[in-house]
């Protein structure tokens, strides 16, 4: 009898513990930031679009404010569209907000956990970041990499001059060749180079799969693993296609780098030192697996190829629609460079309007309109609201860039917004004054893009050389009428967590015969003095 009483007492105690935990959970949920009402059990999952989630998140931000929350089943998500909170959470509380949400697709199927973008905040993450920072820090870019940047952007001018109808490909070749040369010592000499085509095909599918809402939420509802994948958009097959493509491409360049090192050592051949040389020298000491080395090079190949090329294509769109901006930029360029030399990195301090155009391009149509989500690794309170451990936290780049209180008429392309802000993006990202932040395309906090220093210099040189060399205007139809360039955020750009302009027509013409002559002369010198130091595929 006593045993029965003890059992009943224990059961009551357990029930009280469960009820208390449930009550505490309910009480804390009531203290979450405001947000859209959801359905029982599933939360807001049916309200989330499969594409362009940044548009929905920005719509909700106008209703619920700079910090709001929503539910995906039992999981909590929060969206930050407030400059002060970006600084407070991602920078000042970066130790709490630097992890990544669990991603079965990204971490298990595609990368085996070795991709820096989806890697959790850990010792391996810090190791990867340190390796990248050492090779792509500002001083290395200034001392070593700028020479290659100038040479590749000089070829880009030559390519635009000879084949203006392929403008959508020239920027991709340029940025891909820059990063391939720095990573592996192998150039991308033309737009039809196989490794470039393969990378962009992989990147397109990877971007679509990793967009918020694009795959079933198996991390939250594990039972979805048992639902036939053909009912859910063949998400496993698509993920495995990306995994195979990445592994094949990234490991092939890993092997080529090893072969090139052996050949150089056996023949005493001179070759440009690369990022992978540094990694291979330390691989055994650091305990890096071959798969980790593959993805160290691969993640930089992705980031270095896609962001810069897309932003240059966006800039050309805007320039073609705004001849007055071209006119002001050329007045500045002509005063500094004349027509017998193109701009170099040394001209940066004297070309502030070019830098303003770059900043406005990144603000206007950001390539990452919804930065890759962060995860909270500990319970936190923000302005009286509770965010539980494990909350997925989105940095709403699109919403920040199109905040009418900060950027009046945000859909208008207007470089003068950045009058007086002539430093590079890193300086403003590191500034304690969050109102001075120019844009958020590189992310925030400890997850700030490690390629920011290279990207900023490359973007400036690409913009400066193209504006110095060419006139841009909409193409014309058979009747001489301008063909519309679609810059609508929905119809004019691709889907995915990385967005790119859809193909558009544009007339590109050299500004004068003297400019054309200078382009060819400078390319000949760049080819013999710089580009020839790197291997051909």
From Swiss-Prot:
**Metabolic or biological pathway:** Secondary metabolite biosynthesis; terpenoid biosynthesis
Which controlled-vocabulary keywords does the entry list?
Answer: Heme, Iron, Metal-binding, Monooxygenase, Oxidoreductase, Signal
List the effects observed when the gene is inactivated: Loses the ability to produce yanuthone D. Also leads to the loss of production of yanuthone X1 which does not have 6-methylsalicylic acid (6-MSA) as a precursor.
Q: Does the keyword tRNA-binding apply?
A: no
Enzyme superclass (EC): oxidoreductase
Give GO MF terms, alphabetically: heme binding; iron ion binding; monooxygenase activity; oxidoreductase activity, acting on paired donors, with incorporation or reduction of molecular oxygen
Q: Pfam families from the entry?
A: p450
Summarize where heme binds, as residue positions. Answer: 449
Q: Describe how this enzyme or protein is applied in practice.
A: Yanuthone D is an antibiotic against C.albicans, methicillin-resistant S.aureus (MRSA), and vancomycin-resistant Enterococcus.
Query: What does the entry give for GO biological process?
Result: terpenoid biosynthetic process
The organism's superkingdom is given as Eukaryota
Signal peptide stretch:
1-21
> What is the annotated role of this protein in its UniProt record?
Cytochrome P450 monooxygenase; part of the gene cluster that mediates the biosynthesis of yanuthone D, a fungal isoprenoid epoxycyclohexenone that acts as an antibiotic against fungi and bacteria. The first step of the pathway is the synthesis of 6-methylsalicylic acid (6-MSA) by the polyketide synthase yanA. 6-MSA is then converted to m-cresol by the decarboxylase yanB. The cytochrome P450 monooxygenase yanC then catalyzes the oxidation of m-cresol to toluquinol.
Q: What is this protein called?
A: Cytochrome P450 monooxygenase yanC
Species for this entry: Aspergillus niger (strain ATCC 1015 / CBS 113.46 / FGSC A1144 / LSHB Ac4 / NCTC 3858a / NRRL 328 / USDA 3528.7)
Q: What is the lineage of its organism?
A: Eukaryota, Fungi, Dikarya, Ascomycota, Pezizomycotina
Q: Which gene encodes it?
A: yanC
């Amino acid at each position: 009898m006593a045993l029965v009483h003890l059992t009943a007492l224990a059961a009551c105690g357990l029930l009280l513990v469960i009820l208390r935990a449930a009550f505490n959970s309910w009480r804390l949920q009531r203290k979450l930031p405001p947000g859209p009402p959801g359905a029982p059990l599933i939360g807001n999952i049916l309200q989330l679009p499969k594409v362009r989630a940044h548009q929905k998140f920005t719509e909700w931000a106008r209703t619920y404010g700079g910090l709001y929350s929503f539910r995906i089943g039992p999981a909590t998500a929060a969206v930050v569209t407030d400059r002060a909170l970006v600084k407070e959470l991602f920078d000042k509380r970066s130790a709490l907000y630097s992890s990544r949400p669990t991603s079965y697709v990204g971490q298990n199927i595609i990368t085996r956990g070795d991709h820096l973008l989806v890697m959790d905040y850990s010792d391996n993450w810090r190791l990867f970041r340190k390796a990248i920072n050492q090779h792509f820090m500002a001083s290395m870019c200034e001392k070593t990499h700028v020479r290659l940047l100038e040479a590749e952007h000089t070829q880009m001018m030559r390519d635009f001059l000879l084949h203006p109808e392929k403008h959508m490909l020239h920027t991709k070749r340029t940025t891909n060749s820059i990063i391939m040369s720095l990573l592996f010592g192998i150039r991308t000499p033309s737009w039809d180079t196989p490794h470039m085509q393969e990378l962009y095909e992989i990147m397109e599918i990877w971007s679509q799969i990793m967009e918020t809402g694009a795959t079933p939420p198996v991390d939250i509802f594990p039972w979805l693993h048992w639902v036939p994948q053909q009912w859910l958009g063949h998400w496993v097959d698509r993920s495995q296609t990306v995994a195979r493509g990445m592994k094949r491409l990234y490991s092939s360049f890993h092997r080529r780098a090893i072969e090139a090192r052996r050949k150089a050592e056996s023949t005493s051949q001179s070759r440009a030192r690369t990022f992978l040389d540094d990694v291979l020298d330390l691989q055994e000491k650091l305990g890096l697996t071959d798969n980790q080395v593959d993805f160290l090079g691969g993640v930089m190949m992705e980031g270095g190829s896609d962001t810069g090329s897309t932003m240059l294509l966006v800039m050309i769109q805007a320039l073609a629609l705004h001849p007055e901006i071209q006119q002001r930029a050329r007045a500045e360029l002509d005063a500094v460079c004349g027509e017998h030399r193109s701009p170099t990195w040394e001209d940066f301090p004297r070309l502030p309007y070019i830098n303003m155009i770059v900043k406005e391009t990144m603000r206007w149509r950001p390539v990452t309109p919804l930065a890759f989500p962060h995860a909270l690794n500990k319970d936190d309170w923000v302005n009286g609201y509770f965010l539980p451990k494990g909350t997925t936290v989105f940095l709403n780049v699109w919403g920040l860039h199109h905040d009418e209180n900060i950027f009046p008429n945000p859909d208008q392309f207007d470089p003068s917004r950045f009058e007086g802000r002539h430093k590079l993006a890193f300086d403003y990202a590191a500034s304690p004054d969050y109102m001075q932040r120019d844009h958020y395309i590189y992310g925030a906090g400890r997850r700030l893009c490690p390629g920011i220093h290279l990207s900023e210099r490359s973007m400036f040189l690409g913009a400066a050389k193209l504006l110095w060399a060419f006139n841009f205007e909409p193409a014309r139809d058979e009747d001489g009428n301008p063909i519309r360039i679609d810059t609508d955020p929905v119809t004019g750009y691709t889907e995915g967590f990385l967005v790119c302009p859809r193909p558009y027509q544009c007339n590109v013409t050299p500004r004068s015969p003297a400019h054309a002559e200078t382009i060819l002369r400078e390319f000949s010198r760049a080819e013999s003095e710089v580009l020839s130091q790197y291997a051909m595929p």
